[in-house]
Structure formats: C-alpha cells, structure tokens
C-alpha cells in the first residue's frame, strides 16, 4: 500500500479552498448574457469553445492532490445540479465558492463548524420556501420560449423552437438534440409511436417514389415469436380479407414460407399487408410489444399468456388510424387504445424510472414513456463550423432542460434577482447561538454572488448593482446585463426556472457545508522516482568479459 500524505485543519482547508477557487474562477466567467467563452484543449481535433459551466468544470484536473479534492467537490456540485435541473451549473458553482470562502473565514476565526453548517441549512430552507411562494406558473407558449431564449444565452430562435417542440410532443415527449449537416437549425417532429424497425421485404412498399408502405386504418397483429408458416392463421387472414382493411404484422421475424405467401398475396392484390420485426431485444422487446398493444388496443399473441395463433380473432388485434413504414422506421399514428389504459401504462413506466439506478435503463424507459405519451421531436443544430455547432448544441441542451424545469416548477425573476430578494426572508430567522447566526449570515451574503458575477461579467461593479437592486422594493426589479439597464425582469422576459435556482442553492450549500466542516485530508503521496541508472547498468556489462564460456 502506498504511503499517504495527511493534512490537518487550517493547512487542509487552505489547500481545499485554493482548488475550489481555481475551478470556480474558470467556470464563473461564463455566467450571464455577457459571460465569456472558455477554450478547452482536446487531445485530438480543434479546441472546444464553450459557455457551459459543467463542461468547463468536468475538464479541470489539478496537479496538487489536495487542491484537486476541493476542485472535484465543486465539480460534483455542477454535475449534480446538471443532472437534477439540467441548467444552473455556473450559478451553483458561484454559490458554492461564496459559501466556502465565507465559511472558511469563520472557522479560522474560531467558530464551531457544525453550528455554522446548521445555520447554513436553516437559511437555505427559508430561501427555498420563499422561492416557492414567489413562483409563477408557466401557462403560455411565449413564456416557455422566453425561458429557452435566456438559457440559450439570448438566442430567440432556439427558445422559439423548444417552445414549438414542447407544444407538439407535450411535456412527457422526448426532445432530442442532434448536430445538423448544414447551417440551418431545424425542428423535426414525429407524432405517434415510432420504433427503429422497417419493412421485412421491399415488396410491401405501397409508394415506390418515397419507398414507404402506407397503411390506412389497419389491423395490427402483435406476435412475440417468429412466423415461419401461415397455416395456423389462415382463418384470421380470411376474416381480414373480408373486412377489406390492411394488416400489419409485428413479429420477432417473418421468414421462409410465411414471408413468401404474404408477398405473393400482396402482389396479387388480394391482401393489403406489411410485416416488420419487433423492436428491442430480450425483456425490453416484450415490454415494447406490450406498449404497442396498449397503444393500439390489441393483445400480444404470446404462448406465455396461453394464446395461440389458431385461436386469434379480429378483436384481439390492435387498430390505428395510420401506419407509415420506411426502410428503417415504423410509425403508428393515433392508436385505438383506451386513454385510461395508456395513462396507467405511463404511470407504471414513471414508477420504474424513479426506481432504476442505471442511466441507460432510465434513458430507455423515458424513450418508451415519450412514445406512449406524445411523440418525439428532434432539434437539429446547424452552424458554419464544427466548433460552432458543438457550442450551439451545448446551449440548446441547456435551454431544453431549463424549459422543462420551468414547466415543472414555474419561474422566478432571473439575473440573480430571485435569490437576492429571497435573502430578505432570512432576517426573520431565529438562531440558537451566535455561530448559527453567522452561518445564516454566510448564506445572506452568498446569495448575492450570482447577481454580482453577472454584473461583473458585463463590465459593471457588482456591489453597486446589487445594492441598487435591493434598495428597490419591487420584487421583479433587477439589472439587465444585456442592455445595461435596470428594469422589471419578468416583463423584460428575464426569468429563471424555480427548479434550477432551488437546485443550484441546495447542491451548493450541501457540498460547501461539507468543505467547511473538513478537519483532515488524506491523499496518496507521490512516489519519488528513482534516478534512471542506464549508464551504471551498462558499465556493469564489462564484467561479461571475465566469464568462462
């Protein structure tokens, strides 16, 4: 086991704070509409230019192990805020730095760290309650667009596109962000359920120009196993021919005689039919087939459930208004499933999302939920160069998460105003002792840091700006760093999602509280490398001359 280096009290905290400052100073320059860019070296390709706090934080690794621990703990603040709210990472970092600095001074002055932390926690809870009271719910698409615009650093096109996407696919729908091939940024919406399997044979195509199979009001047979012969389902096929409706078969595979018979019938025009393979693999395939069955009001034909192909009747099949099958995708539009069943299934998937610990599983479950609940929208981000596209994609991702958070928990005035105003709620708090009172005061000072930093990034004096804002009694009154004017933030469309502000403060206070109460640090001592003994070793080779062979 390697030797360890151990540091205590003031020495340990000093190193920690140096690491916190190094990381926070690099991250905080990106805050606000006039925030600056950070250029990050890449091991290959061109450097990455970003204004995304968490991207900067994730790149920082320091040589000194003790300083690095401090930096990594603040990086954890940014990552956690990003995971929970999707935005507000820079605000969280600025808050954490402010709390740690003030807290370290208090500990150095001989105050009890545990009482300080209790005071900090009390103040944070009071501010969170105040934010909830002051929250305004989002109701119109234009408000949704405003939130998106602010998180995308003032790019109105992005805000508008996100608002449009959310209107089309609903709050549960999946909105993905991809890099576009050209300069334009586009929005592409797929309504209904889409899965990544296309037609089994090109003979099923109904529109040769577009290379798609288009089925109107089809019956949908959902079969869990392979179909290699059609003998068991002949009675069912006859019923479908009599109904005059098309048939879509979704099965593990359709092969051999079954495929040949279906193709021949399709070409003769006796039966309008198409077949696709079932999406997913293993247990996920079963779950997705069940989703399709619920969406279309049909049943999964599975021997596990005791249903055989011979016994299948028309009322066991699913229905949909339209099915569009391309080479690699199938889209089911307006399935005939009961609304109550679909809602029940959605709630079941939501419960699974809450329980799962795997990010991959969570992502797949969210995709399934979106396909059932609304649809899928894709925002394709364009730009003149690869570097620009990557930078814009970062901003679109942030804006998307912020907009979702705003719809979920509502909005408060932006530009650091909500936190600064909420600090006034702390004045009524009672502390058990002087050290706790000082902990409460630490938060009162720290919550002004984001507003000051936004002003400083815009070339103004942060202390003067925050003083002027707090002197005004209007709750929404703040400083617009973009125009350099004082105004009503909500009317000007400068708003923050409550969830983002709340999460940033709670995460920052949580990690900063741990840093303040740190008394010892243990790190691996760097091994001293022995000097390279090449010359001496080679000199020793001379002895070989005296050997007897």
From Swiss-Prot:
CDD domains: GroEL
Annotated Pfam families: Cpn60_TCP1
EC number: 5.6.1.7
Annotated keywords: ATP-binding, Chaperone, Cytoplasm, Isomerase, Nucleotide-binding
Annotated compartments: Cytoplasm
A Gene Ontology biological process term: protein refolding
Catalysed reaction, written as an equation: ATP + H2O + a folded polypeptide = ADP + phosphate + an unfolded polypeptide
InterPro entries, alphabetized: Chaperonin_Cpn60_CS, Cpn60/GroEL, Cpn60/GroEL/TCP-1, GroEL-like_apical_dom_sf, GROEL-like_equatorial_sf, TCP-1-like_intermed_sf
GO molecular function, one term: isomerase activity
Keyword Ribonucleoprotein on entry: no
Example of a GO cellular component annotation carried by this entry: cytoplasm
Residues annotated to bind ATP: 30-33, 51, 87-91, 415, 496
Protein purpose: Together with its co-chaperonin GroES, plays an essential role in assisting protein folding. The GroEL-GroES system forms a nano-cage that allows encapsulation of the non-native substrate proteins and provides a physical environment optimized to promote and accelerate protein folding.
Family that this chain belongs to: Belongs to the chaperonin (HSP60) family.
HAMAP family recorded: CH60
Subunit structure: Forms a cylinder of 14 subunits composed of two heptameric rings stacked back-to-back. Interacts with the co-chaperonin GroES.
This protein's name: Chaperonin GroEL
Source organism: Acidiphilium cryptum (strain JF-5)
Lineage, highest ranks first: Bacteria, Pseudomonadati, Pseudomonadota, Alphaproteobacteria, Acetobacterales
Recorded name of the encoding gene: groEL
